[in-house]
């Protein structure tokens, strides 16, 4: 694929993720949008790593590191959301006032 096509795909994914993160009122949806943003960044890392110097794997290694961070976020995030749901009976972001108490 050409570089422009991959970058446009990544920009679309990033834009959808940012839009969803800004407009989301549900914590689960916000976590999913955050994953979209991280995947768009990974696509950019791998694309630029392959385009500029395919012999060095710096972009690929950094992408694997971001995937590991995203896996930890995907494991811890729903646990935090379920804990908030048990205590507050809601997963809406605007109803979470945990720092006010």
UniProtKB/Swiss-Prot annotation:
InterPro entries according to UniProt: NADH_UbQ_OxRdtase_chain4L/K, NUOK/Mnh_C1-like
Quaternary structure and partners: NDH is composed of at least 16 different subunits, 5 of which are encoded in the nucleus.
PANTHER family the UniProt entry points to: NADH-UBIQUINONE OXIDOREDUCTASE CHAIN 4L, NADH-UBIQUINONE OXIDOREDUCTASE SUBUNIT ND4L
Keyword Oxidoreductase: no
Regions that span the bilayer: 2-22, 32-52, 61-81
Species this protein is from: Morus indica
Pfam families cross-referenced by the UniProt entry: Oxidored_q2
Similarity annotation: Belongs to the complex I subunit 4L family.
Membrane topology listed for this record: Multi-pass membrane protein
EC numbers, comma separated: 7.1.1.-
Function: NDH shuttles electrons from NAD(P)H:plastoquinone, via FMN and iron-sulfur (Fe-S) centers, to quinones in the photosynthetic chain and possibly in a chloroplast respiratory chain. The immediate electron acceptor for the enzyme in this species is believed to be plastoquinone. Couples the redox reaction to proton translocation, and thus conserves the redox energy in a proton gradient.
Localization (cell): Plastid, Chloroplast thylakoid membrane
UniProt keyword annotation of Chaperone present: no
Superkingdom of this protein's organism: Eukaryota
This protein's name: NAD(P)H-quinone oxidoreductase subunit 4L, chloroplastic
GO biological process per UniProt: ATP synthesis coupled electron transport; photosynthesis, light reaction
Disulfide bonds: none
Reaction catalyzed: a plastoquinone + NADH + (n+1) H(+)(in) = a plastoquinol + NAD(+) + n H(+)(out); a plastoquinone + NADPH + (n+1) H(+)(in) = a plastoquinol + NADP(+) + n H(+)(out)
Any one GO molecular function term: oxidoreductase activity, acting on NAD(P)H, quinone or similar compound as acceptor
Keywords noted in UniProt: Chloroplast, Membrane, NAD, NADP, Plastid, Plastoquinone, Quinone, Thylakoid, Translocase, Transmembrane, Transmembrane helix, Transport
Upper classification of the organism: Eukaryota, Viridiplantae, Streptophyta, Embryophyta, Tracheophyta
Coarse class of the protein's main subcellular location: plastid
